Structure formats: structure tokens, C-alpha cells
Amino acid sequence: MGTIRQKKKNRSSVPKTKAKRTGQLKNGNKKINVLGNAIIAENWDRKLTLTQNYRRLGLVHRLNAPAGGSEKRATKDGTIVTDPEDPLYIKSSTESIAKTLGLGEAKVERDPETGKIIRVIGNDDEVEIAGRKRRRSNPLNDPLNDLSDNEEDASAGPNKNGPSAIVQQLERQADKESSQVAKKKPRHLSKREEEWIEALIQRHGDNVSAMVRDRKLNPMQQSEGDLKRRIRKWKEMQS
């Protein structure tokens, strides 16, 4: 049984307040500011979705390969434009044969001992050399041999014109920012640090050991090496 206080809280008409979750969407995912970059914000079309905007800018919004449900774009003549397949994706023999062979007869290779079908010999397993059809050499049964001959052309399709102008601007911006980060900026003494070091020198001169033991001017008990570095910077600024 609940306590009297809990029963009163349940009967109360005062709504229970919940802590507002900032930076999160309703589905619990983290809210991402897609307009954080000035170049992307300038070329962003609010009428399009995130995927459509990224595709138009020549970018990708996911590093993983699409798992289905990708949008099919139609050209003016009515044909459907499909994205090229990933050249690193390894097709199985059944997938490649299922695309080339329909219902009908096919050549198969059986195990001489068990009689089980090892593989189906399709049109892709035969090549024409000097006018004669010969079997494609694949002694290791490498599944990469099942890839189409047009794979290189398909993979080079979207990049045949090179990166877009927006991608080039983003690359130049990234190179500029990385070079600025790589440069190590020297740290200068603040105004309060200058006054503090000057007071220590006026009282103790060059005796750094006495500065370390001074509880009044050195309440944080800075080490001897730290004080020497600060004094050296202070002298460089005075010269």
C-alpha cells in the first residue's frame, strides 16, 4: 500500500513536470545542426529533404551503404536512373546468375562423387577468345570473378566530372582549418601575471627559491621551474 503523500500526489490536478531535453528530437535521436557550415547553409534548399540536399551538393549523409528504399530518379525520357553499385560488394554466384539467366535450361557442374550441384555455368563463365568461346579461368572459385566487366565504368560514373564546386570549397576550408590548428601559437602572459611576476622580482630579485617559499605572493605554491618560465617570458616582453 502506498503512503498518504503518494495517494495525494496521484489525486492532485497539478501536472507532473518533466525535464526538458534540449538537443534531442522526439524520437530520441540527437538534433544535428545541418546549417552549421556557412558554405552548406548558403547552398541549402529548405524545400528539399536532408538526403536530397546532400545529394545535390555532392555529399553523403551516411557513410554506410544503402540498405534499401533509396529514391529512384526519372529522366526526361522516362528512364529510371539508378545509383551505381558498390564496387567492393561481393556478389554471390547465385545473384549474378539469377540476373542473367531466366527460366529455362542451364549448364551445371556436379561433384563426381556425391552428384551434388557445385555451381551453375552461366554466360558470364564463358569468354570469347579469337572467335571461340572458352571457359573463364577461375581455379580458386573467387567470387570477385562474378563481378561485371562494366564495374569500373559504373563506379567511375558519378566522379567522372570530378568533385563539385561546393565540395572543392569544403575541401579548401578543411585544409585551411587543419593548417591553422597545426600551427602552435605561443602563450603570452596576461596583465595580472605580469603584475604578479613584477611584484615577485621587486621583492626577491633573482632568488627563485625565495619566491617559491613566499606564502603571500605565491599562495598557489608554483614550482621553481614554472616561475623560471614565467620570469623568462616576462623578461622577453620587457625587452
From Swiss-Prot:
Belongs to the NOP16 family. Involved in the biogenesis of the 60S ribosomal subunit. The gene is nop16. Keywords: Nucleus, Ribonucleoprotein, Ribosome biogenesis, rRNA processing. Component of the pre-66S ribosomal particle. GO terms for cellular component: nucleolus; preribosome, large subunit precursor. Its main location: nucleus. It is found in: Nucleus, Nucleolus. This is Nucleolar protein 16. The keyword Cell cycle does not apply. GO terms for biological process: ribosomal large subunit biogenesis; rRNA processing. The keyword rRNA processing applies. Residues 1-23, 132-192, 210-239 are annotated as: Disordered.
